[in-house]
A protein has these predicted regions:
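Residue-level detector of anion-binding/catalytic polar loops
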Residues: 35, 69, 86, 184-186, ...
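Conserved catalytic core of nucleotide-sugar-dependent glycosyltransferases
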Residues: 52, 73-160
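C-terminal catalytic/acceptor-binding lobe
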Residues: 2, 6, 143-209
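Short beta-strand-to-loop acidic/aromatic patch adjacent to the donor-nucleotide binding site
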Residues: 59-71
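Active-site nucleotide-sugar/metal-binding loop of Leloir-type enzymes
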Residues: 49-62
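Anion (oxyanion) recognition and catalysis
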Residues: 30, 81, 178-179
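N-proximal low-complexity "stem/linker" segments adjacent to membrane-targeting elements
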Residues: 1-46
């Protein structure tokens, strides 16, 4: 039986969603029988914890997170959903030149360019990711629980300084907690997306094998 998919529509509290995202979403998600919910909140940690709590209270098995400034295709979504792993990401660059992927690698060596689509990294940006319910269930003992208007929520997404004085964003923090549990942070290097700002930042990875 196919997994039930939850897709939160996230904006940054302004109500503005990039036109490229709307077109991508309509093209890639139409006809899939997914559960959709929109969230509007200016704080990244708040919106992600709200979306995750809604997902966990649903009967869906997996959550597909796509930021509202990502340009993607149906094929990108198909690839992400095809992997039998609990957590997987697509690649997109930061909104800056020269282009840099929104990932932190395990070593200083470039891990990309080989034949295998899945590459393990240390951390990845959450702008295009698929996560199974089991990831959050395993992570609950590591994070605080709180209540919001009578509903239980968990601080899966947090930002701040760690014990080494390094500032970590909410997606970095999430990856670190998953790796503490022995999980792998995997990216599909064949999914190379555009990050929409004043310019559409995008690139592809050449095969070096």
């Amino acid at each position: 039986m196919a997994s039930k998919l939850f897709v939160p529509i996230l904006d940054n509290g302004t109500g503005i969603i990039k036109a490229q995202y709307v077109y991508s979403a309509l093209t890639a998600l139409t006809g899939r029988g997914i559960a959709l919910a929109r969230f509007s909140q200016p704080y990244p940690t708040r919106i992600m914890n709200m979306a995750t709590a809604t997902f966990l209270s649903s009967d869906c098995d997996e959550m597909l997170i796509i930021d509202c400034d990502i340009n993607f295709t149906r094929a990108d979504v198909d690839k992400l959903l095809s992997h039998d792993v609990p957590l997987v990401y697509g690649l997109y660059p930061k909104k800056a030149l020269p282009l840099q992927w929104c990932v932190a690698t395990l070593t200083d060596e470039n891990p990309f360019g080989g034949d295998e689509p899945l590459v393990e990294v240390k951390r990845a940006g959450r702008g295009f990711m698929r996560v199974h319910r089991s990831v959050f269930e395993k992570m609950k003992p590591l994070v605080p629980e709180y209540h919001n208007h009578g509903r239980a929520e968990w601080q899966f997404w947090h930002e701040g300084c760690d014990n080494d004085g390094e500032w970590r964003s909410e997606d970095w923090w999430f990856c670190d907690n998953w790796r503490k549990l022995g999980g792998k942070v995997l990216v599909d290097q064949t999914i190379c997306l555009q990050h929409i700002g004043d310019y559409s930042y995008g690139a592809t990875i050449p095969n070096n094998s």
